[in-house]
Amino acid sequence: MFTLADISFRSRLLMGTGKFTTKEIMLQAITAAGSELVTLAMRRVDIKGGNDAILPTLRTAGVKLLPNTSGAKDADEALFVARLAREAIGTNWIKLEIHPDMQYLLPDPVETLKAASKLVKDGFVVLPYCSADPVLCRRLEEVGCAAVMPLGSPIGSNQGLKTKDFLQIIIEQTQVPVVVDAGIGAPSQALEALEMGADAVLVNTAIAVALDPVAMARAFSLALAAGDLAKSAGLAERRKYASATSPLTQFLSHYEVCK
């Protein structure tokens, strides 16, 4: 269990809702994953209520919705989308995403920090997607973000924890929850993030594009459950040198006597 803002979640797996072939498969995958916090791109929501299908579907899942500002290219656009989400969905929670580079979808650190500061002052619970930059994460924490969401690797790349060394520093230094977001392509990578000390992970592409998204969602859920249990059990310390599991001193002393 971990806490974001004032809400506790049993599952450490946050899920994205893009790239699924059907709404039904998306819903089944959310259920299989056991996710309680699900992201939703505002650009996919028909705010006029005409042919919007995804929002009613997600509301039947009984999960907390986390709208995001995906598609925003600067702070002003992100502020507009966040306020639209608050009005349309009725939540002050927002996943802040600003990535003007459409090839790599890397977050803009300057605009992200600027937008985060304004959104917090406007009463939002802000969860910013950001680069794995320890200094930036400290700044985001200082302006009042409820968590930081540093990337493991580029969005949808399935490359895993390419930023592992920097993620470790962020986990050590940051006082708010750390949710590793983007690039996680396998359950083992999600497990590794938890074993490093991350509070949760957000996964979308690896589940949505799998041959069997529902089974893959379940696989991620099991991996994170194992990681959570291992974390609470206390992982053995890593050592540079070998450490014998059974001392041989007494046995060898007996050998010397027999000679």
UniProtKB/Swiss-Prot annotation:
GO terms classed as biological process: thiamine diphosphate biosynthetic process
A GO CC term assigned to this protein in UniProt: cytoplasm
GO molecular function, one term: thiazole synthase activity
SUPFAM superfamilies: ThiG-like (SSF110399)
Catalysed conversion reaction: [ThiS sulfur-carrier protein]-C-terminal-Gly-aminoethanethioate + 2-iminoacetate + 1-deoxy-D-xylulose 5-phosphate = [ThiS sulfur-carrier protein]-C-terminal Gly-Gly + 2-[(2R,5Z)-2-carboxy-4-methylthiazol-5(2H)-ylidene]ethyl phosphate + 2 H2O + H(+)
Active site per database record: K95
Claim: Transferase is one of the keywords in the record: yes
Chain sites annotated for binding 1-deoxy-D-xylulose 5-phosphate: G156, A182, G183, N204, T205
Root EC class: transferase
UniProt pathway annotation: Cofactor biosynthesis; thiamine diphosphate biosynthesis
E.C. designation(s): 2.8.1.10
Protein location: Cytoplasm
Alphabetized UniProt keyword annotations: Cytoplasm, Schiff base, Thiamine biosynthesis, Transferase
Subunit structure: Homotetramer. Forms heterodimers with either ThiH or ThiS.
Known function: Catalyzes the rearrangement of 1-deoxy-D-xylulose 5-phosphate (DXP) to produce the thiazole phosphate moiety of thiamine. Sulfur is provided by the thiocarboxylate moiety of the carrier protein ThiS. In vitro, sulfur can be provided by H(2)S.
Similarity comment: family membership: Belongs to the ThiG family.
Protein name: Thiazole synthase
Biological source species: Baumannia cicadellinicola subsp. Homalodisca coagulata
Gene: thiG
